[in-house]
Amino acid sequence: MKKFALPSYLNIPVVALLFAALVGCVSQPEGVKPVNNFELPRYLGKWYEIARLDHSFERGLSNVTAEYSLRDDGGVKVINRGYSAEEQTWDEAEGKAYFVNDSDHGFLKVSFFGPFYGSYIVFELDQDDYQFAFISGPDKSYLWFLSRTPNPPQALIDQFVAKAKALGFATDELIYVQHDNNAG
């Protein structure tokens, strides 16, 4: 399994400055509000990425999942995993997340790179069964639809697109993630 890696020609100070500028702040995009009555124990476990806006760290990946578990320090361990058909390898990144405010609000900060954190905002959630979640990052270029199943109903996908579009996300640029049993 290959870990997500930065190109070797980039040095740490340049990467640190760039990363801090891009996701160093923990902020909320205009109009995006975290859900209330968030229950972390129910959110933990495996989620399938159904749709996303494109970013280099996930480019070309299929079968993408996110797995959340408790850390010893009270935070959340995050393992993102996806399959690169081009390289025929699984890529994995491990991060950590902590609540920004109260633990009953779906607003966390997440880091995959040292001390730099970006927003992780759960702005829509199936609060009955915790079967789907709509996620934003620190601005409207970050958007994900997560589901407990790799093939949610089309009506739920349509609900995600409508909600995201109403909030000003570029839904015409969404990437729909392929999930199959043939990877790896």
Regions from the PLM with identified roles:
Residues 19-184:
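A beta-rich soluble binding module of mature secreted/lumenal proteins
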Residues 2-14:
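Bacterial N-terminal signal peptides that target proteins for export
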